[in-house]
Amino acid sequence: VTADAVDAPPLELAGSVAVVTGGASGIGRALCAALLGRGAAVVIADVELTALEATVAELSALGDVSGVRTDVTDEVSTATLADAVWARHGRCDLLFLNAGVTSGGGGLPWQQEPNDWRWCFGVNVVGVGIGVSTFVPRMLADGRPGQVVLTSSRDGGIAPVPQASVYAASKAAVSCFAESLQHNFVREGAALRASVFYPSGGLMDTGLYSAARNRPAELARVGEGTGRASMTFEELKARVAAATGREPAVADLAAMAERVLDGVARRDFILADGLDGTAELLHRRADAVGRGELPPPHVVAL
């Protein structure tokens, strides 16, 4: 697939219809607010009904916003979301598959329990697959230009993070799938394009580190484990400050969301800031692979 083949005309976000999973908090909420600010109609999908209803109420002054409680790991729930979107708007132009969780396992790779894998991959990977298989055929049938944005992470999407092995593995899968999705859109001559989003800019005030609040009872850990307990954002900042000896940078989620939408409008495949350090790490990883050595990981202070 050549670069020319991947190129697609810019998208007009005003008047578009966007769906954002995991949209009631953190990065997802920031994306919803930014989309409304650019004149898009937004359908927020989230598993937390109370947070979803509050977010819809808070953002309603910005434009056409609605919410559908959705469990992204469930095909019926996701199909209900799609039906609600087409019933209300008649189409979906922008699909942000953003819902994500940590494994809750922590510790060493062999200390992760099967349910840690099922929980993390169920949301981060299977949830993306269900979203794509549910929405993309309908979007393709409509024949309209559109974008499918998958939220990955530099923690795994770029390079492994040894102390977060399951989460990083799930995000590596998301990045790999995003590339495959884009190649197939182009080869099929589709009007759709894919993007992979790498959030950046510092620590992020999201619900990721307290995601265990939504963990189903049937996927609970069997043993006590060595995993990190759920923590608030302030507790996360304190943990990183103690590990590094300095106050951590905090990402501006609103500004990040605006930059993401700039990239979506341009039909960029990779949505990220500050790729210089990433490129350097990838070069070192490629060199190590060429020598048959263990590639360097992505080092984070957690």
Regions found by a protein language model. Give the residues of each.
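Catalytic loop of short-chain dehydrogenase/reductase
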Residues: 149-173, 178-179, 183-187, 200-203, ...
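Substrate-binding pocket helix/loop in short-chain dehydrogenase/reductase
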Residues: 106-109, 113-118
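Canonical Rossmann dinucleotide-binding motif of NAD(H)/NADP(H)-dependent dehydrogenases/reductases
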Residues: 10-42
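Active-site loop of short-chain dehydrogenase/reductase
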Residues: 16, 64, 91-92, 139-153, ...
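SDR active-site lid
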Residues: 187-271
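The beta1-alpha1 cofactor-binding region of Rossmann-like NAD(H)/NADP(H)-dependent oxidoreductases
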Residues: 49-50, 69-80, 114
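A short, exposed helix-loop element centered on a Lys and neighboring polar residues
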Residues: 132-133, 179
